[in-house]
Swiss-Prot record:
It is a peripheral membrane protein. Its cofactor is heme c. Disulfide bonds: none annotated. GO terms for molecular function: electron transfer activity; heme binding; iron ion binding. One of the extrinsic, lumenal subunits of photosystem II (PSII). PSII is a light-driven water plastoquinone oxidoreductase, using light energy to abstract electrons from H(2)O, generating a proton gradient subsequently used for ATP formation. The extrinsic proteins stabilize the structure of photosystem II oxygen-evolving complex (OEC), the ion environment of oxygen evolution and protect the OEC against heat-induced inactivation. The keyword Transit peptide does not apply. This is Photosystem II extrinsic protein V. Pfam families: Cytochrom_C550. NCBIfam families: PS_II_C550. It comes from Phaeodactylum tricornutum (strain CCAP 1055/1). InterPro entries: Cyt_c-like_dom, Cyt_c-like_dom_sf, Cytochrom_C550, PsbV_cyt_c550, PsbV_cyt_c550-like. PSII is composed of 1 copy each of membrane proteins PsbA, PsbB, PsbC, PsbD, PsbE, PsbF, PsbH, PsbI, PsbJ, PsbK, PsbL, PsbM, PsbT, PsbY, PsbZ, Psb30/Ycf12, at least 3 peripheral proteins of the oxygen-evolving complex and a large number of cofactors. It forms dimeric complexes. The lineage of its organism: Eukaryota, Sar, Stramenopiles, Ochrophyta, Bacillariophyta. Binds 1 heme c group covalently per subunit.
Length: 163
């Protein structure tokens, strides 16, 4: 009886806690936070609240299993934090760079294709979740990746010390 009561209490507490203390929703983010770099020229765009919500949902469903908290499970040395993205070749710290990677992934130095081992549009036959992903979806997912350092700060891509 005690076990059932404690589980019920935990469930109720978690629900109430998540309602009041939950993560920032797209509507809560101001325009400055939703502003991301589009390409290597430095041009910026402001993501709509819908793009932010969609990007989070798609990232969690498609990428979240291997990139929890911006860390790469298969290679913890290369994360999705701003520094790692900016040091990649070509740079992945903008929407165009991330969309390009999601279409045709390459190694960190950009020399070899990794489409057979990393989900992408190019390897949609191997990774079914990528089959129905559109360019708008890719833009939303890239926007989510670029927004996270602004929302969760250094925790995004920070690794084991935070998660």
């Amino acid at each position: 009886m005690f076990k059932k009561s404690s589980q019920l209490f935990s469930l109720v507490f978690f629900t109430i806690f998540s309602i009041f203390i939950g993560t920032a929703s797209a509507i809560d983010l101001d325009e400055a936070t939703r502003t991301v770099v589009v390409d290597s020229s430095g041009k910026t765009i402001v993501l709509t609240p819908e793009q932010v919500k969609r990007g989070k949902r798609l990232f969690n469903a498609t990428c979240g299993a291997c990139h929890v908290g911006g860390v790469t499970k298969t290679n913890p040395n290369v994360g999705l934090d701003p520094e790692a993205l900016s040091l990649a070749t070509p740079r992945r710290d903008n929407i165009a760079g991330l969309v390009d990677f999601l279409k045709n992934p390459t190694t960190y130095d950009g020399l070899e294709s990794i489409a057979e081992v990393h989900p992408s549009i190019k390897s949609a036959d191997i990774y079914p979740r990528m089959r129905s992903v559109t360019d708008e979806d890719l833009t939303a997912m890239a926007g989510h990746i670029l927004l996270q350092p602004k929302i969760v700060t250094e925790k995004w891509g920070g690794g084991k010390i935070y998660y």
